[in-house]
Curated annotation (Swiss-Prot):
HAMAP family: TrmFO. NCBIfam families: gid_trmFO, PRK05335.1. InterPro entries: FAD/NAD-bd_sf, MnmG-rel, MnmG_N, TrmFO. Belongs to the MnmG family. TrmFO subfamily. Its cofactor is FAD. Keywords: Cytoplasm, FAD, Flavoprotein, Methyltransferase, NAD, NADP, Transferase, tRNA processing. This is Methylenetetrahydrofolate--tRNA-(uracil-5-)-methyltransferase TrmFO 2. Its EC number is 2.1.1.74.
Amino acid sequence: MKNKTVNIIGAGLAGTEAAYQLAKRNIKVKLFEVKRITKNPVQVLDGFAELVCSNSLRSNELTNAVGTLKEEMRLLDSLIIRAAEYAQVPAGGSLAVDRVLFSEYITKEISSNENIEVIDLEVENINPNELTLIASGPLTTNKLQEQITKLIGNDDFYFYDAVAPIIEKESINMEIAYQKNRYDKGETSDYINCPMSKEEYLNFYKELINAEISIGHLPGEAELKYFEGCMPVEAMAKRGVDTLLFGPMKPRGLNKPDGTRNHAVVQLRQDDANDRLYNIVGFQTNLKWPEQKRIFSMIPGLENAKFVRYGVMHKNNFINSPKVLNKYLQLKTNENIFFAGQITGVEGYVESCVSGLITAINIANFINGKEMQVPSSKSVSGALLNYINKASITNFQPMKANWGIVDEIEFKRPNRKVTKQEIKKMKNEKISELAIDSIKDFIKNI
């Protein structure tokens, strides 16, 4: 049996999930977090597991890969999923949270755990002889980044993503905007929709692509590497005049109450438990703040919008996981060092959490002399870990949960006449069922 103390660097989603999982297995944890000493440009709260991009953990539906992933994590006793359900706010078929309540719940659970020692400190040195889980996230400090570079022998791991603005609900003009979920999913209408005619859209588009961008703190636009899942809306727009119509401004399933179709729709999603703040869905941005006020006020219904937070751009880091980590997210060159979270190349809140969860289970097995295990790729959890272990070394790109990375299944079409959409739904239901069964088998063996 090895030393039953683990250093965890970073009290974000992956780090807190891992700390909880190790502590419940009676393993002592030293959890290092720097934010109470100095915050990065997008952090606001003092608590752990702060959500700095969207407040949504995305779909809860089992026919969706990330919905199935959440169910897998429930079966694995995920602290993060429990916190999200505690802090949940209405969001149709999605799991969205009040950021403050969510962080407070996790901070309390971690801080009160007798097996976890929280240390407010910027880690400047990593002891290669101590068991360490690096879960420093996509905003790793420069000093820690230098240490990681020494460990992996490579400093080519960076990208940028962006944060969407938040506005006050009472400043939204509900004579123009209307409440509706896409295709009327869910029991309540949780999204506020701002419709646009073709003329309004083209005027908005023209201003957006010509707006001033805040680049003073960036090394040059040519060097930017954006996450597809959190791309600035202005960068997306520059791909073509219709690009936004198939992205954050997609009008399908969002007709006006009288049935009239829109050329484009901007959606707003509840951001707090008190239903006072709404974020502009998919509108992560790096525009200068006066430009955000000017251009986003062109959106019908937001002409008098009061912005409580403007969008900002921030640097994120990830490593070349297929090159430097084994399938247990353990450093190939040092068995004492593990990684988890977005720094490994999983993209998304829930994905980060599950990497911390599974890695913690394997660290516990490693300490206790048991065989380390990874869930089958029939599960979403296993498929994610399999992806970051076996993806291209020369062009590794972060990945969200999706059915495309899960093992293919044999699916027989029903004899009766069904639509393509019905077939897709039935197939996804079957994949989800097998994924959940796979996790149940994994649990039996750990």
